[in-house]
């Protein structure tokens, strides 16, 4: 298998891995709908995957600190490929849910280890840009993946899972040939650390606020991924159009990461955080009130822009403030995973009890509580920079 260098790994691998997963994560709810699944079962797809992810991601990050990054980075796509391959034969909703849990194992050991590997490839002022390149790579797949998945599903419901399995197996062989463990590089030129350390109350207070914001973002995203397809199918929207609509989230995240990567003005700025969450609130209101596809696309763009800031901030501050990068990326992944655990499941409960638009009212309530908590954390401690 051909080898690629470090720069290409950072540019290509997140795209490749997330393309595989985004193909799976649209096709899985659609096939559960075809199997007669209800909204709670749709939500359980995300909840099962994210529960395993949440529990194991922190452990995976810490294990990568001890065992090295390579073994976990290589194992992740292999486990994901096996789960996709088995899904091609699944005939019951229970089978899909069980395999979604196996997916969570692959994601939980891959992402924290790979993020820590990326963080160790640069230090000082280049860290934020390197994380930005990583973020742009995986979100580029979110533009293509849902659209491709919807198209493949329209050909045959099992084709998306064959495609995701093939992509994951190829990635396994590429990583096995290309990735090696490394020691963290020293900061160039004695770069100043503007964000403090884990002993800094101000920096950590802002980090906790960002973690809460990112939890809320992924609570919302979980509902969009696993509950919106049901609302859309009830409105007679085709699978390919659903994929196009969900791709709007990836497009706006990509653009958000692109602009954030080129500036540090948003670092530790409460106004940027609150502004991003105002975008999410606006998008949720649009989904809750209006039925038009163009309005849905606009709402997804607003929410995607918001998520780009909370995700970028959470990952960057986690590896910048915490001394052990595997620990930082593990916590980052576990916290966003907890949002995906609760979001789709609770959204499914209210959708079944009240109606298909109820999950978006629930998301608005969670977002409001999150903002109140963030204001308390960022006001009670002195932030390094306002």
Model-predicted regions and their roles:
Residues 324-353:
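A late C-terminal transmembrane helix in Major Facilitator Superfamily
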Residues 109-122, 309-322:
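Intracellular juxtamembrane helix-capping segments at the cytosolic ends
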Residues 160-176, 360-375:
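Symmetry-related core transmembrane helices of the 12-TM Major Facilitator Superfamily/SLC fold
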Residues 270-314:
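C-terminal transmembrane helical hairpin of 12-TM major facilitator-type secondary transporters
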Residues 71-85, 271-285, 364:
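Structural signature of the two symmetry-related core transmembrane helices
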Residues 2-50, 206-209, 218-235, 242:
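Helix-loop boundary and gating motifs at the non-cytosolic
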Residues 56-68, 153, 256-269, 351:
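Helix-to-loop junctions at the C-terminal end of transmembrane segments
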Residues 50-58, 142-143, 250-258, 340-341:
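Residue-level signature of mid-helix packing/kink "hotspots" within the transmembrane helices
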């Amino acid at each position: 298998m051909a080898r690629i260098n470090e720069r290409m790994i950072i540019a290509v691998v997140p795209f490749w891995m997330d393309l595989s997963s985004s193909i799976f994560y649209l096709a899985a709810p659609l096939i559960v709908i075809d199997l007669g699944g209800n909204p709670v079962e749709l939500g359980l797809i995300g909840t099962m995957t994210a529960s395993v992810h949440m529990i194991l991601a922190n452990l995976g990050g810490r294990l990568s600190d001890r065992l090295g990054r390579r073994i976990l980075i290589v194992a992740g796509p292999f486990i994901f490929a096996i789960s996709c391959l088995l899904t091609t034969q699944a005939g019951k909703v229970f089978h899909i849910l069980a395999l979604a849990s196996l997916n969570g194992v692959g994601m939980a050991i891959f992402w924290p280890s790979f993020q820590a590997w990326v963080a160790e490839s640069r230090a000082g002022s280049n860290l934020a840009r390197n994380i930005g390149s990583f973020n742009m790579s995986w979100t580029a797949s979110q533009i293509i993946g849902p659209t491709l998945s919807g198209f493949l599903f329209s050909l045959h419901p099992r084709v998306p899972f064959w495609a995701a399995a093939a992509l994951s197996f190829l990635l396994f062989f590429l990583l096995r040939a290309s990735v090696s463990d490394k020691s963290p590089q020293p900061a160039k030129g004695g770069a100043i650390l503007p964000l403090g350390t884990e002993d800094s109350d101000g920096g950590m207070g802002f980090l906790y606020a960002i973690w809460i914001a990112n939890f809320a973002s992924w609570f919302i995203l979980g509902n969009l991924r696993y509950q919106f397809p049901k609302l859309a199918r009830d409105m007679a929207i085709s699978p390919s159009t659903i994929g196009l609509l969900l791709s709007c989230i990836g497009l706006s995240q990509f653009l958000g990461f692109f602009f954030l990567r080129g500036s540090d003005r948003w670092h530790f700025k409460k106004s940027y955080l609150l502004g991003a969450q105002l975008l999410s609130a606006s998008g949720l209101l649009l989904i809750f009130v209006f039925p038009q596809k163009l309005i849905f696309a606009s709402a997804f763009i607003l929410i995607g822009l918001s998520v780009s800031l909370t995700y970028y901030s959470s990952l960057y501050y986690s590896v910048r403030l915490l001394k052990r990068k595997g620990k930082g990326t593990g916590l980052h992944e576990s916290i966003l995973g907890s949002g995906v655990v609760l979001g789709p499941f609770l959204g499914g409960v209210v959708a079944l009890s009240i109606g298909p638009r109820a999950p978006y009212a629930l998301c608005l309530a969670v977002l409001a509580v999150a903002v109140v908590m963030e204001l308390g954390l960022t006001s009670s401690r002195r932030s390094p920079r306002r």
